[in-house]
């Protein structure tokens, strides 16, 4: 991809604030997206993931802060809606997107053939996009965002709702684009996917709770965790959650009398959960 020639480029955003009326969607959020790396943005519904990605892609402007991105024609964007036209064939969808990118017919045909082959969609080139499976449609949407070989690709939950085999195929496409020098920012609700990324930004209610490599986020988790089969009582219940058939409890100030249960080492899923609990604790919500 052409992004390989910009291996030192670092895209991203600084101190973004976005409001929808009286609702603050992002408040002081920053992110870096170096070339050749995959950056994950994680968080629950309403965390601000899509708003941040729209700002990065140039689809909207923040009320405050700066966005560093290549020119719009050097940016690829997959919105949550996918942007695929169901009444066009697979090939026609790519041709339509290529025209929007200003690609010549010859280059468009060459790239379409290349990316259809990468995605395993070449046999389906003549099928209507509306007749594809969910996984195939997402593959089409992802390669449409990659077709012009941009320097920055922004993907809003590209693997949500697809089968495990299609998820694996989508990640192969994403990893290859990064290996070829493209900077990739993606939103995901799957923390196992975030663990594969170079860096992770954790959002909650428009606020950045944590950022860094997956290992750095885990290492920075405050307090300690314990696991038990029994439901925690009292104040500990507000700091507990179920996972893999057991209760996990976060102790902000661990000590000899922290509580019952077995001490465990956290992973990224635990660290993200604790980051949200720590914010609630600071806000006096429990």
Regions found by a protein language model. Give the residues of each.
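The feature captures the beta-strand-to-loop junction immediately N-terminal to the Walker
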Residues: 42-44
